[in-house]
A protein has these predicted regions:
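Extended, solvent-exposed functional surface patches
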Residues: 1-158, 167, 250-251
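Long, domain-scale non-catalytic interaction/scaffolding regions in large secretory-pathway
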Residues: 12-22, 157-160, 166-336
Length: 336
């Protein structure tokens, strides 16, 4: 049986890293990439090649392929997966259930976090010029009905899941440009105690988007962050979340989702370049196994942080170099 040991690090600008291997472990191999683009493309390929096609996975594939299209556009490469995107959109449209939303498979009963992933994918596709057949008014009516139906039970829910659902519904209605009484809904949701850090962060994001006067200062959100041994920032509940049968199937309530929410808040607040870089580094630290955990998280991480890393300068990226034991390398990928 062979066993490997290693370290993963993100080197920004002129950063230096001291790595002292254990001679008893044998030969050391160093692999370096010049930018994060290959990591994104690898993640996109993993999502694209994933063999199963539940509604979440199809929506995640759409998101991933749209991200691939943006990368290819940047580098002047021909995108050849339009038919694949169109086919996925057609299947998602056919799987919309009688409640105008989506469940795990086919036209099963609604799962709100899956519906959110699907709706976001459809809206992103429309922005890129694809036809989705999405009936926005019917969808708006369904989401608004779901919001009103869930409100009474949310105030007394101690798990945070009901509040999380309300936040998702209001967020989707905003993305659909629905004409609803946002101040009333925001005030009600904000009045519900936060049972989780995710509740607190998502409430802050809702207020930032819809009621800025009630938005907490960015510094107060940074005070809630945790740090990895490498100094990367992430957001985790200090106490373990109460286990429930539903929570196992709620990937939208996790450290990753908390950290993505914090990232979006700080990006929108502006003047937080250093903090955003440390958050991105956290996500790359989580790829120690070579990929993120699942199609849902991978697609959401890529769509959130990738645009900020597509720093374009005359159509090319700034030159990168790496010095190892005094020897400079300028061609990547590098393996030695």
């Amino acid at each position: 049986i062979l066993e490997t040991h290693g370290e993963f690090a993100v080197l920004n600008d002129t950063a230096a890293l001291r790595f002292t291997p254990d001679p008893a472990l044998g030969t050391v191999t160093i692999h370096a990439e010049a930018s994060a683009m290959q990591a994104f493309l690898d993640e996109i390929e993993n999502i694209d090649l994933y063999p199963h096609l539940c509604n979440e996975q199809m929506a995640s594939k759409v998101k991933a392929l749209l991200s691939k299209k943006r990368i290819y556009t940047l580098f002047g490469r021909k995108f050849k997966d339009d038919d694949k995107v169109t086919n996925l959109l057609r299947k998602l449209a056919a799987n919309q259930n009688d409640g105008k939303l989506w469940g795990w498979w086919n036209r099963e009963q609604t799962e709100l976090w899956i519906s959110q992933q699907v709706v976001e994918a459809l809206l992103d596709a429309e922005t890129e010029g694809y036809k989705t057949g999405l009936d926005r008014q019917a969808l708006t009516d369904a989401l608004l009905a779901g919001l009103n139906r869930r409100m009474p039970a949310a105030a007394s829910d101690s798990t945070g899941m009901r509040k999380n659902e309300l936040l998702s519904l209001v967020g989707l209605l905003r993305k659909l440009d629905a004409r609803i009484d946002y101040p009333r809904y925001c005030a009600f949701i904000a009045s519900i105690p936060d049972a989780t850090l995710g509740n607190r962060l998502r409430t802050a994001e809702m207020l930032q988007q819809l009621a800025p006067d009630g938005m907490p200062a960015a510094d107060s959100l940074l005070a809630l962050a945790s740090r990895t041994m490498m100094g990367s920032l992430y957001w985790r509940d200090k106490a373990p979340l109460e286990p429930t049968p539903r929570r196992f199937a709620q990937p939208d309530m996790s450290d990753v989702e908390n950290t993505l929410t914090a990232y979006r808040i700080l990006r929108a607040a502006g003047n937080r370049k250093a903090e955003l870089e440390k958050i991105r580094n956290y996500f790359f630290e989580q790829r120690k196994s070579g990929s993120w955990r699942n199609t849902y998280e991978s697609s959401r991480i890529v769509e959130t942080i990738m645009p900020d890393m597509l720093e374009k300068d005359g159509g090319t990226f700034r030159e990168a170099s790496l010095t190892i034991d005094g020897q400079r390398f300028g061609k990547f990928p590098l393996t030695r």
